[in-house]
C-alpha cells in the first residue's frame, strides 16, 4: 500500500478524473471499499462496533462508502460527521443518502472531542 500526502492525493484524483475520465464516485467507491477489504485480515467485521469519522470533503464520501461495506459485513457502524454538510460534494451527498437509507446512524459533530462519548 502506498500512502500519499494530501496534495498528492488531490493531484492523483484530478488526473484520474480529467485525463482518464474516471468518475468521482468510482474513486470514492474504490477508496471506501479498499479500506474495509484491506483491514479484513485484522478486523472481524461481523458484530464489530465501528466508528467512522467523516469530514465534508471527498474523503467523507470515502468514509460513507467504507461505512456501507463494513455494515454489509455485519459491523455495527456509527458515522461521526464533522463539518458543514452544505459544503459536501454531490457525490458525497449521494453516498450519505445511501447510508441513511441503510439505517446507519450519522451524528454531526463540530469538534473531534464531541465524538468521544460514542467510542466505547
Where does each model-flagged region fall?
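Glycine-rich phosphate/dinucleotide-binding loop and adjoining beta-alpha-beta core of small-molecule
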Residues: 1-4, 44-53, 60-120
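Positively charged, low-complexity intrinsically disordered leader regions
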Residues: 1-48
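Short, flexible micro-motifs
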Residues: 24, 35, 58-64
